[in-house]
Amino acid sequence: MIGLIFGDTDFPMEILKTIKKKKINYLIIDLSKSKKFKKDKKSYSVSIGQFGKIINILKKSNCKKVLFAGKVDKPNLSKLKLDIKGIYYIPRIIKASKLGDAAILKEIIKILAQNKIKTENSLIFNPELYLKKGNFSKIKPNKQDQLDITKAIKTLNSLREYNFSQGVVVRNQKVVSIEGKGGTKKMLEKSRSKKFRNHGVLVKFPKKKQDLRVDLPTIGLKTLKQSKTAGLKGIV
């Protein structure tokens, strides 16, 4: 039995397809905005602040392992629906929120671990979604591209440990934009250039100490199209 804690984006659907194909027993904790999994009989729609309900659902189903997938927006703590355990744990979440979005996820993992629930890597059932090191296009990066890539990696590594930014656009060794709360789409919109076409790179890169079980940098088809529209040469 695996507990699937799902948010938005298409990533959770890919995991669910594999889970069903392999006939693995599962349940879904649906944290998506639109409650996109409500038609699944094994799905439970809850608020992120209902820790008691979430933990009870998992324990009642003898579910000792979970994985996180999809985007879950940082909650408005003043409007959060809390149950008794939520009230108990909320001071820890508030404290973590001051460090950034990634810190909230890490704190939730700790809370689950204290309740003897282990968090698995989100790609445990879908290793094919993980790209290995290498060049997957016909275009090879030149010297300028390599300089841009190096600049981008240094920029991401210089950010705070709990900063949610996982992406940066660099063109001609200048940082054009860094991923903010608007996500990759907003960052790429800011990076559009009429002067430079086929110049610059988007680098999506995990920072040091980043917990890849719940905070995995992802790139989808939309990002590829948006990068082309922005006039970038490649993605790393």
Question: Where are these predicted regions, by residue range?
Answer:
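Short beta-strand segments
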Residues: 5, 30, 68-70, 170-171, ...
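N-terminal basic/disordered segments at the start of proteins
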Residues: 1-31
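N-terminal glycine-rich phosphate/adenylate-binding segment common to multiple enzyme folds
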Residues: 54-124
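Feature captures the catalytic cores and cofactor-binding loops of soluble hydro-lyases/lyases
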Residues: 31-56, 60-63, 83-89, 93, ...
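Conserved mixed alpha/beta catalytic, RNA-binding, or beta-rich assembly cores of soluble enzyme
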Residues: 9-11, 19, 45, 98-102, ...
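Short glycine-/acidic-enriched loop or helix-start segments at secondary-structure transitions
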Residues: 14-15, 38, 77-79, 212
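Short, well-ordered alpha-helical microsegments
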Residues: 12-13, 51, 75, 105, ...
